[in-house]
């Protein structure tokens, strides 16, 4: 889409933050209005993360206006809210390509812009990185400032509090901005609070505060009285005691949509020494009524008509694997009150909305706390309950030690329902589920299953739920099933694959939902096709039988080749001294960028044509 200068005259003046800082302060509200409208127009045409960015327009403008970016370091947590940041930092005309193949990255990305200090996508990393940036700048005496922006969801994670605890100890010159959009701006975030924030962040108050501490440092009773008086004054209007106890100077909460007020407060805070904390209140979806009313639905959107405010409905076709999981969860919980379902802030994405409403006493959203989710599940298992941890593949990485130390070593019967395994698509490198088979396969006593369709997914969830000798994992992709008939639930024999087609010379050992592509290739090559189903334990007897009956084996998976299911097949053959050629097909040894799932699979040779071509090239 071409940029309409007449429609956005103030925004047209801002091709960089240097130009932004040349604008008169009085023009900033108009800039914010145009930026918000441009964001709405762009994302509705291209798709992307939406509501979060609408809520951070004023904050983004104020930060770049006050701080000398990119020299000063601005770090965004997660990055859903960073679209306005991209627009103001030289990427305005490319914003329509975001999350598309070859387009702008969905999150701040170091390789894309000097303004993107930290590549992000996962939650709660900003403060830790910000401390490092601040310490590095101090050691080099560069007078460079560091600012982190973190949301009210991300700040609940343990990593954020670990970082703040460290900051309180070493006291770097760092500003943490809490973007609190959990509720609309309420009465306690009004004129008094905004005035107090500017007063408490000002040089006069800061000088008196620090000077008083020095003068009375040797008089403990007076020092303590001053401390309590300050806390009392702040405590009348602010909820910052926790952050003060962690060693931060807390300011807020203030109106995050008052750009002029934010500029004044940030200017006051810019030169303060030590860890600073600014708490702003924003409205997710601000300025677009449908998104304000339903920020969860409008968090990430497909292309839609923003004049109607109606998102396109799904085609009503095949159910997603997430829905298959959610339906299985409800079906099983209706029969077994011992089932306990756990999610780290992924209720909607994991298909658990209906379950959370029907079985609220058996549902636990632990927030962005993957480590806690896994060890919490371990405790439930110790208490003779049956925990099911619903988690995205990419986020399970954050709880790897807990899977090993708190679950697997103790052989606790915890079921991991691993969604978004394999190619995820538009969210790019940080969200592809490329590694779970590799890092789970090496854990002793772990059962790892890869369904080839939605019916097999249900059967595997049932199998894992009723397995009592240790943890089980069922990994399934983002997207819809194949239309398979859903059969009555029954446990599968552990570690047994199924021959789907008998052929000659070549055997294709498929792990997961690429089975339809593998079937098309097997038909063309007259190859044997096997649905292996289990990555661990592998069907050793079947692998050895196939090796004895065929000239070559091909393994197929949507996981990293290194350490994946195919590597397991190689290990079996080497251990039994079977000298049969094996071609491992899967994800290559680099981080997979964004695109649609179909585009990425075609690029990687994981569609039927690509798989066939890889086999032909290998045999040539």
From Swiss-Prot:
One of its GO terms (molecular function) is thiamine pyrophosphate binding. It is an enzyme of class 2 (transferase). Gene3D superfamilies: 3.40.50.920, 3.40.50.970. It comes from the Bacteria. It catalyses: D-glyceraldehyde 3-phosphate + pyruvate + H(+) = 1-deoxy-D-xylulose 5-phosphate + CO2. The keyword Transferase applies. Binds 1 Mg(2+) ion per subunit. Binds 1 thiamine pyrophosphate per subunit. GO terms for cellular component: cytosol. GO terms for biological process: 1-deoxy-D-xylulose 5-phosphate biosynthetic process; isopentenyl diphosphate biosynthetic process, methylerythritol 4-phosphate pathway; terpenoid biosynthetic process; thiamine biosynthetic process. Mg(2+) binds at residues 152, 181. Keywords: Isoprene biosynthesis, Magnesium, Metal-binding, Thiamine biosynthesis, Thiamine pyrophosphate, Transferase. Its cofactor is Mg(2+); thiamine diphosphate. Homodimer. Belongs to the transketolase family. DXPS subfamily. Catalyzes the acyloin condensation reaction between C atoms 2 and 3 of pyruvate and glyceraldehyde 3-phosphate to yield 1-deoxy-D-xylulose-5-phosphate (DXP). This is 1-deoxy-D-xylulose-5-phosphate synthase. The lineage of its organism: Bacteria, Pseudomonadati, Pseudomonadota, Gammaproteobacteria, Enterobacterales.
